[in-house]
Swiss-Prot record:
It holds the Pfam family Glyco_transf_28. The lineage of its organism: Bacteria, Pseudomonadati, Chlorobiota, Chlorobiia, Chlorobiales. It catalyses: di-trans,octa-cis-undecaprenyl diphospho-N-acetyl-alpha-D-muramoyl-L-alanyl-D-glutamyl-meso-2,6-diaminopimeloyl-D-alanyl-D-alanine + UDP-N-acetyl-alpha-D-glucosamine = di-trans,octa-cis-undecaprenyl diphospho-[N-acetyl-alpha-D-glucosaminyl-(1->4)]-N-acetyl-alpha-D-muramoyl-L-alanyl-D-glutamyl-meso-2,6-diaminopimeloyl-D-alanyl-D-alanine + UDP + H(+). This is UDP-N-acetylglucosamine--N-acetylmuramyl-(pentapeptide) pyrophosphoryl-undecaprenol N-acetylglucosamine transferase. It comes from the Bacteria. It comes from Chlorobium limicola (strain DSM 245 / NBRC 103803 / 6330). Gene3D superfamilies: Glycogen Phosphorylase B (3.40.50.2000). It is an enzyme of class 2 (transferase).
Amino acid sequence: MNVLFAGGGTGGHLYPAVAMAVELLKLVPGASVSFAGTKNGIEASEIPRLGYRLHLLPVRGLKRGGSLRAILANVGILIDFAGALINAGGLIRRENPDVVVGTGGFVSAPVLLAAQMMGRRTLIQEQNAFPGVTTKLLSILASEIHLSFSEAQQYIRRNKGVFVSGNPARSFTLNSREKAQEHFGLQQQLPTLLVFGGSRGARSINSAVLKWIDAITERANLVWQTGALDYDRIRQQVKHSGRLWIGPYIEQMGDAYSASDLVMCRAGASSIAELTNTGKPSVLVPYPYATGDHQRYNAQALVGTGAAMLIDDSHLDAPEAQQIVLDLLHDPHRLSAMGASCGRLAHPDAALQLARRIIQLAKP
């Protein structure tokens, strides 16, 4: 069996593909797996590091806006896309994949389109509640479309072959709350807030938490991943405390989730999948510049079930934002109800189920 994954640019598009590949090779150890990507995406370094073959294609994303510079840039990008489509066709002829799996990102479109034009079986895995342009356009001819949110179904112009399978996410070893809090050097029996904004951090969230830190640690613990860009600035402004762990990156994310009672973070698809799989209540702050405002749609999917609360990025400076977080942190009954609602949205075996669907599609 030969499977070609096309997706990347960011970890949110790449790692679901990697998770599927891992499960696929467990089920079919002799399978041939390779990835298509771009030289500027995260896949350029990650895929070789993980030991998979990588095929690089020259493709760029469209520039947004109506300025002359954006229009001229897009003309060049469309010319590049035509070349990428031809290269993708050549790649598919050489690799002869049984199934092509698209997970989003700039490279996904030409590879999926070329595969569809050549009559190959294709599977689209969409991470967000508001599907990207590639998913909406190419889902019409895809063999199967797998969504992470049921809310995304309304944007797909077909019913047959559409499944809500969840988003493949990192798996964690979860410890007891007590052991996890001990790992971070926190005070036992106090509620714990976990804050993160990705490996690079989230400046607006960090600035808000910096203002709230005394109020938070007065009666609670704080585990705070600042991201690499903000760490030095913030570390210099906070006092050491037995109720605070702060670092640029959390290596043991399983312990972070195990120790926490409430999570505050962005609403990217990977974070949402981790929250649902661990059943953690959250305060979500959608990244306001995400394409199509898709993080807001992701957040609203959880808010609508009672699993989370949403604070606009522009409202983080308001006193009400701090009060929302503090009130939740000290309301164990509400946190329990939110966590239960969040857990009901979980798809912990998403990667395995998707791998099984790929195997089924690959059969003659």
